[in-house]
């Protein structure tokens, strides 16, 4: 099973509070910061809510 590399490409400043909370819950604080998370339904659901702020790529283990 693959992992997902999630990179914040747009700032969370002046975004709705819920979008900021979601980005911080993923561990994304600054623009161009990246995290690796497992590819599952929960992670995909979180990404869907802030898809306009992040870039996602699949990474093999």
From Swiss-Prot:
Superkingdom per UniProt: Bacteria
GO cellular component labels: cytosolic large ribosomal subunit
Cited Pfam families: Ribosomal_L30
Gene3D superfamilies: Ribosomal protein L30, ferredoxin-like fold domain
Family named by the database record: Belongs to the universal ribosomal protein uL30 family.
NCBIfam families for the chain: rpmD_bact
Assembly behavior: Part of the 50S ribosomal subunit.
Protein name (Swiss-Prot/TrEMBL): Large ribosomal subunit protein uL30
Record organism: Oenococcus oeni (strain ATCC BAA-331 / PSU-1)
Gene that specifies this protein: rpmD
């Amino acid at each position: 099973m693959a992992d997902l590399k999630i990179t914040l490409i747009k700032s969370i400043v002046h975004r709705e509070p819920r979008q900021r909370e979601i980005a911080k819950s993923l561990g994304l604080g600054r623009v161009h910061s990246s995290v690796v998370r497992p590819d599952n339904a929960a992670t995909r659901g979180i990404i869907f809510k802030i898809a306009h702020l992040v870039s996602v790529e699949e990474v093999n283990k």
